[in-house]
């Protein structure tokens, strides 16, 4: 027994002397909802500038995934959910390295089922629950764990707030109703994913507390408040309408009272519509031509010369009547009644 202990102790002391690097410690795969993270811890070693390389087995050969990283974890979420994998990691320093540390892993069996999301609606003496399964890493938003596991269900646990007695119910649907609860009582609820065929459970969600109502009667103080508010709103509305109409009436009355009234003759004219029609037709149409009279004035001397033809031969030719012949467009002077002049009038259009 003593030789074995001495050999083991000698080998342990020779490790730092020969420069051998110890492997990573506490290597494990931490997978939640198919987010696969390989984690480890830095080994006890005098030098602190160690790096690490992590690999996974693909088609019977290992592929580097995280090479010479100073981190103590490596993300393997890209792996298929239905395969069996061997992943490994080692510590490195310059050209030296430690032994590999292997971990076997099957995502669909080993991943941890995270807590679902839950919404609660209080209705009378019951609580209506709605669930959402956890989403899958590196998949579209519509993909959840329910799309991966055919036997997916929800396990609901609820209890009255302040008590230790808990009740459970399992539902394969995305909703559940907790009935026959005590009215006006606060209940706390939490939910977890559950695989019926594997009897495998996930993590519990955080408790959510909600108060129930009462379907039979509504509290009298609520009815009183609603009634008072309704009456007050109607009263204010009617009062506002009355004030607006009163202001309009006062403004209209003041306007007509202070304004000047129409003249009496204009009121009489407007009171007989046929006067307006007569006034309209009293003006000539715009296309009608103007009418004027041409007046000719003939003196007695001119008339006498016409009666003595012999005198006309000896006399000089008659002179231009000049200004004694006038044309007037609108009006012409009329001769006096005692003037023996002959007036002739012709109309031209």
Curated annotation (Swiss-Prot):
The Fibronectin type-III domain covers which part of the protein?
23-111, 112-215
- What residue stretch is flagged as signal peptide? 1-19
Membrane-spanning segments: 221-241
Q: Where is the composition biased (Basic and acidic residues)?
A: 322-341
One GO location term (cellular component): membrane
Xref: SMART domains = FN3
- Tell me which CDD domains the record gives: FN3
UniProt subcellular location: Membrane
PANTHER family reported in the protein's UniProt record:
INTERFERON/INTERLEUKIN RECEPTOR (PTHR20859), INTERLEUKIN-10 RECEPTOR SUBUNIT BETA (PTHR20859:SF50)
Attached carbohydrates are found at 49, 102, 161, 199
GO terms classed as biological process: defense response to virus
Describe its partners and assembly state: Heterodimer with IFNLR1.
Instruction: Name which cysteines form disulfide bonds.
Output: 66-74, 188-209
Source domain of life: Eukaryota
Q: What does this protein do?
A: Shared cell surface receptor required for the activation of five class 2 cytokines: IL10, IL22, IL26, IL28, and IFNL1. The IFNLR1/IL10RB dimer is a receptor for the cytokine ligands IFNL2 and IFNL3 and mediates their antiviral activity. The ligand/receptor complex stimulate the activation of the JAK/STAT signaling pathway leading to the expression of IFN-stimulated genes (ISG), which contribute to the antiviral state.
Family to which the UniProt record says this protein belongs: Belongs to the type II cytokine receptor family.
Q: How does it sit in the membrane?
A: Single-pass type I membrane protein
* Protein name as annotated: Interleukin-10 receptor subunit beta
Q: What is the lineage of its organism?
A: Eukaryota, Metazoa, Chordata, Craniata, Vertebrata
- Identify residues that carry Phosphoserine: 299
GO terms for MF: interleukin-10 receptor activity
Question: Hey, which stretches end up on the Extracellular side?
Answer: 20-220
What keywords sit in the KW lines?
A: Antiviral defense, Disulfide bond, Glycoprotein, Membrane, Phosphoprotein, Receptor, Repeat, Signal, Transmembrane, Transmembrane helix
Stretches for region Disordered: 300-349
Tell me the residue ranges located in the Cytoplasmic compartment per UniProt: 242-349
